[in-house]
Amino acid sequence: MDKIKIVIIGGPTAGGKSEIAVRAAKLIGGEVISCDSMQIYKGMDIGTAKITTEEMQGVPHYMIDIADPKQEFSVYNFSEMAEKIIKDVSSRGKIPVIVGGTGLYVESLIYPLSFIAEKDDDVRARLYDEYERLGADHLYERLKQLDPDDAEKIHPNNVKRLLRALEIYEISGKTKTECAERVPNPAYDVGIFIINPPREELYAKIDARVEKMFSDGITDEVAGLLKNGTDWSNQSMQAIGYKEFRPYFENAVPLDGVKEAIKRNTRRYAKRQVTWFKRYSNAKWYGSSEKNKMLDDIKTFAERKNDE
């Protein structure tokens, strides 16, 4: 069976990924799957610089506006949904174009083994009952038999970690050590293309984007989320562009302080994103003046036979 060919477009925030993804999709007959952990949330448009309908230029986009801001959404939830979409897009003769800067989401598609075990309350409850009846020593001995490498890293009295390690095994049939191995997804033929503008240029784009967020009404957007019951403790409100507003709404800092904090945190995040994508040794990197070359390479990848 042929592997599903997927194009991954990554890079730092404000680097121009969304525009390139649309151009690439039109060039190769693709559809776009967003790989952004915050664009999944409805009503969080300005702070996430969510792509607009006009900017999509008629290209179908998935994994945007799929969750309520009060809802928790894990990398496991993402990979489960995204993999179904990838299969559907491919089954219609289209090429999935994965775009975004959330490294863990990208990783969950390329190396799925690491994310195989979601939490299971029933399994956890049974293991906890086992702990209460037989003690931590029993759990530790059991883990030593199953996964001696992981057992070495856990103190025999660290019940929380012992329970999680055994839970992973019972859910997935694989040890935590096996799940940690980065084994490429055998179902996909993956091309990774990274846009990485020079740092000064990127930082200027970040500053301009944050200024636009404020002129577009980000303060009102955050106020609306809070009014509708979203809480500062929600996962969605931990996002850069939102969490910085908490001291403002608590009358602790002025709006200018919020703006500067968002710029600073976004620059730091962009730096971490670039570091993350460097882990992919087979990725191709491009400067902001090399977009046409990037698109040419994506087209070449899309047209070649699998794993040539």
Put a short name on every predicted segment:
Residues 1-308:
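Phosphate/pyrophosphate-binding catalytic cores of soluble transferases and nucleic-acid-acting enzymes
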